[in-house]
């Protein structure tokens, strides 16, 4: 493995998306293992993988990391002819986020775990608007930046980390959305109308006066 780009993105709901874009050289294996410290298994909601052409790769969650214990592993099938670059994505619940007096603490894997050494691992912790990083504590040293790098990342790296950051009130909303009903209509002229019905559960002690939604850039007549 020549390079891994490890991105940890905190969403406005407090959920976390971890994506690892992996570049390999030489002959591709039939399958590929990636893991995290086992404690994060309780928060994983979904995993998916795709190659550089966005073709979905079969993925199995909750497998053994060879003979190593203490890891939550996932196996990705690599079909013949796949590209040398592929991405693995995990969605974690907002249970990895806890409140502080002026913001939050994020419990996350500082690096992914592999069965072989990684030449270079680049890490980016992507926080929402209205937040400011205070520091990241990890086993190989603390940093006060949202980006850091590790050369020659050892196989079976076990590295939980904690990111502490301040946040403007209301920018992160501790909620769950258990149901979403979507209805899409296409008119004879080709116009598309989409109606979403959400059920939102507020997990915080304060009330929610507004909620942030991401819409397509070409969306119009939003009500």
What positions do the PLM features span?
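Lumenal/extracellular ectodomains and adaptor appendage modules
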Residues: 1-223
């Amino acid at each position: 493995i020549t390079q891994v780009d490890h991105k940890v993105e905190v969403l406005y709901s407090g959920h976390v998306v971890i994506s690892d874009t992996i570049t390999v050289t030489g002959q591709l294996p039939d399958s590929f293992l990636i893991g995290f410290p086992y404690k994060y298994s309780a928060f994983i909601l979904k995993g998916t993988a795709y190659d550089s052409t966005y073709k979905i790769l079969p993925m199995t969650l909750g497998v053994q990391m060879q003979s190593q214990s203490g890891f939550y592993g996932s196996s990705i099938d690599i079909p013949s002819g796949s590209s040398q670059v592929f991405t693995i994505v995990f969605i974690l619940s907002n249970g990895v986020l806890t409140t502080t007096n002026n913001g939050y603490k994020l419990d996350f894997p500082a690096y992914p775990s592999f069965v072989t050494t990684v030449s270079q691992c680049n890490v980016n912790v992507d926080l929402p608007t209205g937040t400011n990083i205070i520091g990241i504590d990890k086993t190989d040293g603390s940093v006060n930046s949202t980006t850091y790098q590790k050369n020659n990342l050892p196989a079976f790296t076990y590295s939980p980390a904690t990111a502490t950051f301040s946040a403007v009130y209301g920018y992160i909303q501790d909620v769950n959305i258990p149901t979403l009903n979507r209805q899409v209509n296409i008119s004879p002229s080709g116009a598309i109308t989409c109606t979403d019905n959400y059920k939102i559960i507020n997990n915080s002690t304060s009330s929610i006066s507004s909620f942030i939604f991401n819409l397509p850039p070409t969306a119009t007549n939003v009500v």
